[in-house]
Amino acid sequence: MLRAKLVDDPQIKYASLHNPLPTQLHAYVWPFLIIWPAFFAVYLSPERYDTYIQGQEWTFVWSGSIITAQSLLWLMTKWNINIQTLFTATKARSLDSAQLIKVIPVANAGSAEICPLHCDTMGGKKTFSFLFQKRRFLYYPERQCFAPLSYVLDAEPKPPVKVFQQAQGLTSKEEIDRIQHHYGDNTFDIPVPTFMELFKEHAVAPFFVFQVFCVGLWMLDEYWYYSLFTLFMLVVFESTVVWQRQRTLNEFRGMNIKPYDVWVYRQKKWQELTSDKLLPGDLMSVNRTKEDSGVACDILLIEGSAIVNEAMLSGESTPLLKESIQLRPGDDLIDPDGLDKNAFVHGGTKVLQITHHNSNGEDGSEKARKLSSGVPLPPDNGAVGVVVKTGFETSQGSLVRTMIYSTERVSANNVEALLFILFLLIFAIAAAWYVWQEGVAKDRKRSKLLLDCVLIVTSVVPPELPMELSLAVNTSLAALSKFAIFCTEPFRIPFAGRVDVACFDKTGTLTGEDLVVDGIAGLTLGHEGADVGKDGAHTELAKSANVPLDTTLVLASAHALVKLDEGEVVGDPMEKATLQWLGWTLGRNDTLMSKAAALAGPRTVESVQIKRRFQFSSALKRQSTIATVVTADRKTSKKTKATFVGVKGAPETIRTMLVNTPPHYEETFKYFTRNGARVLALAYKYLSEESELSQGRINGYIREEIEADLIFAGFLVLQCPLKEDAIKAVRMLNESSHRVVMITGDNPLTAVHVARKVEIVDRDVLILDAPEDDMSGTRLVWRSIDDKFNRDVDPTQDLDPEIIETKDICITGYALAKFKGQKAFSTLLRHTWVYARVSPKQKEDILVGLKDAGYTTLMCGDGTNDVGALKQAHVGVALLNGSPEDLAKIAEHYRTTKMKEIYEKQVSMMQRFNQPPPPVPVQIAHLYPPGPRNPHYQKAMEREAQRKGAATLATAGNQTEHIPTITSPGAQALQQSNANLTPQQQRQQQASIAAAGFADKLTSSMLEQELDDSEPPTIKLGDASVAAPFTSKLANVIAIPNILRQGRCTLVATIQMYKILALNCLISAYSLSVIYLDGIKFGDGQVTISGMLMSVCFLSISRAKSVEGLSKERPQPNIFNVYIIGSVLGQFAIHIATLIYLSNYVYSIEPRKSDIDLEGEFEPSLLNSAIYLLQLIQQISTFSINYQGRPFRESIRENKAMYWGLVAASGVAFSCATEFIPELNEKMRLVPFSTEFKVTLTVLMIIDYAGCWIIENVLKNLFSDFRPKDIAVRRPDQLQREMERKKQEELETQAEKERQRKV
């Protein structure tokens, strides 16, 4: 027996094995091989025909029913994967006999598929595999399941470091062939289907088929114009969706890194290969490429270091230093997410620079540099790395896969939609039953009766629903892109409207990256006569000029900054700020020099050269370096070389490494953290004071030896200014029924200080943490910020209710670990405001805990340390470090590139028709050489010079050689065409110059179409972060309220669509039954006018923009509540009552006909005209009354298209009811009305509208549930302060207006 879990992968929910059936045995074929011959046997025999079919119309009914049934069975196989396997395949008994595998992924991870199974016997071993969503799954007999291809790094436990350090690459042809067969090429092959292939896929979607079926029924009922108009709208909409998908797939295809040449060590020698032939296990040279391409796969560096830009992956543009594992202890296990995180160069990142350390040689000579495995160095002098993952399994590959498969199609909440349709179906079946009963009683034609019943039932399923949902989500995507926010998983946008808890990282999210160094504290610890605070803290801060030599050396050496060949220093902004404050500069080869003439003390520092780094790790909370320090005696100028160790890290961590902890150590660093500063402890020791240790000796040390027996060198105190919009953004969230929480790896005292500044906490805070003096690791205490309150806590017991009610809570990662799994854990999560000193894994646990408690969560982080938490949240937002200026440059570059593409297309098109190329558009004239075809060249060069701040160009001719011209075929054609012109060609040229204005306009209009901002943007690499479904390119915290506004806007749009569609469906069910049996018909023109009105209104609804602020009121989370269902039924009752009253009133004037001809042509009558106008006003009221505007979206008056559309339609309705414009009544085929009738009809229309308005507003005020969840409820004192603040702001605004008026 096969295991229940056939495929072991978190993205796959279920899988089963199958064998295909022959086509003739498919469920939509074999029954009809019997049915069709039987039908024709009856049809072709006159006797049987008269007995069983009895007439032409029943022939049509029977044949139509069989065709519909067969089509439906076939279509069901396209709609549901389970039905497809049931109808077209049988279950396989074993893996050996199976040919197919059905794979169903988890929700929102793409579509289910039936994949062919492949069986290979390479190397004499039988292997089974299948390809699903571009991933190869292999069968592992020992685990009895399929799993994605496993790589060395996927093994548990992880392999030792020496496996990679001693890697020899792929050594034999057999091994290369085997691995090539197993893993395939290193490519992202994204096939782009043709327009017709994609359209076929869309054309069999349930709603599209249903709509076409309805159109067919309307045609049978002879509503030709209306049917053709609807069909045209459907095809156009589906075509635009298909075109959009095709464009997106083409963009994804462009993400593939073009193959380029790389040096690879295979079969014991270095050889050049193209990057698409790289295989896992290859040894390759990592270097900056000629093409400046991204790295082609995921690589683990085993020699050398690289400076890389990961903007294409994480979106972060700050270059990072990646260092090899060459000096890591060989027996340690590789730690890809921790210690060795900085040794991995991921696919898609760009290498900016490579450096080598003289690894093994005592003499430090270049010749001595070699790998521990004995492999010679690459010919291009690059760093050496082991290929660990290729193709779609790389970081970039998985990002592209997420983009492709999570965005396939946005769907409604399927369970809710299904229940909603079933609810409407009750009314439709009742109406259809009424029509059938009445029709049978009057002996009506059965075929027409059946058609009417089917029309009634189908009218209940709102076919616009998926279209409307797509429109609403796409509108939100387009709106977010204007704020530089991109989304890879659009189905998450409605979640943003339901968010209860918003969690923020601190550093780089609420606080800025541009840190300010305040000074060095703690230098006087243990000295007499120092400034001491009440609690013993040494509050004095030393400036850079007064910092002792050893402290200076720690600051100058303990960092990961690197200087690029171009001269730019790259790395952590905090470390840049520190070095700048110190007055030191970083040169080549990790050498640092002091700008200052001299430092205090008997010796001056000549230079510091970093020899080895132990990079910062969030798990270890420290970093260290070994450096050679050259000092000179002030008197004798004698130079001395020493080997120095500099360490910096969290004060609590460094404390355990000191030989002697000075008195008041803790009080001093806590004094600064309480005041919101970021504090790092500094420590050092000398490995040798009089001589320089060789590189070999330095490389022999392990991290634990280096980071022990240290001497304290002070506290580095930095201020992290809040981002400009942090307070405003958090206040908006607090005041709009959200709970805001901070989750940070920083010190709890600093975290609480920042939380108070941004108004996350506003009461006294208690910190749940280990006691300071406890080394046992078992105790927990509540302690206040000033340490005056201390109380022991037992994690196995419930929390003290008094503390929860009266204090704000901060908890550390240590305490969180103690509470995890205990019964009080959920209570703790519910009441905690600040989480400090938590690891990335704990951030994830917090989000999972909040989700399990039933809250909708948002996490906002920086996209590098918060990946797990960002993925776990319902709405994960990565804030990148871009500025508006950066975005303006990117947008300008994008426009120029697009313009160039369009112009190149025009040039090649003209060439095809043997016409001269069009003039170069003014926007890109500076990219082409001067000449008659480039009339705007001079102007463009002046514009570019001004833009770059240069002097205006004197002449274009002098600058020609400096211009970056393009050498595309179009540009070459342009250059060639200007030479050796004949008189006739000159005349053509003059004509083309005359056409320059037209060409410019044409290109501009094409560009505008390309950049149509109402379209949802196509995500490109660099827009999205691997970490999160939402990415803000700007570092502004206000991105969060913007996302929540769009989420609420989409949620409100979805719910109001349900209401409007429900009312329309219920009214049409009544119209098609009771009204229809009374002989009331509408003209084709009348139906088309009302259909167009609905289309315009639906389009306008989905395009309504969100309002600026966030309201305290929350949108309805779902449609099944007393308010929404009550409102729909109440409005429906009003509509029915007015329709019944009007028809009875008309019968009192014109008696009812005894013989109603239901099949007759449409003829205007008093009843037809009156009912049409009443129904028109009912449609208008449905849209206008159920439109949800403020406080979530712009009001109906602000939604201009909808407002004027409804005003125009109301004008038409009332104008016709009052016969204000008689000609209009004639055009619309309405009969004349008497004065009394006009008054009655107009009053009834007003009553209908007013009644619905009253019902909607009464139920909204009585039953709508706008309350936030318990976690987001504000206390009375907070609400009071909020009111007072708003009053004060209003007074200040009025005073300012008054002042300006007087001025």
From Swiss-Prot:
The entry's ATP-binding residues are: D505, K506, T507, F616, R678, D746, D862, G863, T864, N865, D866
Q: Where is this region: A-domain?
A: 158-191, 256-408
Q: Which residues are glycosylated?
A: N287, N474, N589, N734, N958
Region spans: Arm-like: 884-1019
Q: Name one GO cellular component term.
A: endoplasmic reticulum membrane
Q: Locate the region N-domain.
A: 515-721
Q: Which UniProt keywords apply?
A: ATP-binding, Endoplasmic reticulum, Glycoprotein, Hydrolase, Magnesium, Membrane, Metal-binding, Nucleotide-binding, Translocase, Transmembrane, Transmembrane helix, Unfolded protein response, Virulence
Cofactor requirement: Mg(2+)
The reaction(s) catalysed by this protein are:
[protein]-with a C-terminal TM segment(out) + ATP + H2O = [protein]-with a C-terminal TM segment(in) + ADP + phosphate + H(+)
Intracellular or extracellular location(s): Endoplasmic reticulum membrane
* Molecular function, one GO term: membrane protein dislocase activity
The active site is formed by D505
Q: Kindly give the Pfam families that the UniProt entry links to this protein.
A: 2TM_P5A-ATPase, E1-E2_ATPase
**Chain coiled-coil ranges:** none
**PROSITE patterns recorded:** ATPASE_E1_E2 (PS00154), COF_2 (PS01229)
> Could you list the residue ranges that cross the membrane?
25-45, 57-77, 201-221, 223-243, 415-435, 1060-1080, 1082-1102, 1122-1142, 1201-1221, 1239-1259
The GO annotation for biological process reads: extraction of mislocalized protein from ER membrane; intracellular calcium ion homeostasis; intracellular manganese ion homeostasis; protein hexamerization; protein unfolding; response to unfolded protein; sterol homeostasis; transmembrane transport
| Enzyme class, first EC level, given as a word | translocase
Question: In what way is its activity controlled?
Answer: The ATPase activity is stimulated by phosphatidylinositol 4-phosphate (PI4P).
Where is it predominantly found? Answer: endoplasmic reticulum
**Its Enzyme Commission number?**
7.4.2.-
Q: Which residues bind Mg(2+)?
A: D505, T507, D862
Knockout phenotype, as recorded, reads:
Induces acute ER stress.
According to its UniProt entry, the function of this protein is described as: Endoplasmic reticulum (ER) translocase required to remove mitochondrial transmembrane proteins mistargeted to the endoplasmic reticulum. Acts as a dislocase that mediates the ATP-dependent extraction of mislocalized mitochondrial transmembrane proteins from the endoplasmic reticulum membrane. Works in concert with the ER Ca(2+) pump srcA to support ER homeostasis. With srcA, also supports redox homeostasis and virulence.
Q: Which PANTHER family match?
A: CATION-TRANSPORTING ATPASE-RELATED, ENDOPLASMIC RETICULUM TRANSMEMBRANE HELIX TRANSLOCASE
Name of the protein in question: Endoplasmic reticulum transmembrane helix translocase spfA
Source organism (scientific name) = Aspergillus fumigatus (strain ATCC MYA-4609 / CBS 101355 / FGSC A1100 / Af293) (Neosartorya fumigata)
Lineage of the native species? Eukaryota, Fungi, Dikarya, Ascomycota, Pezizomycotina
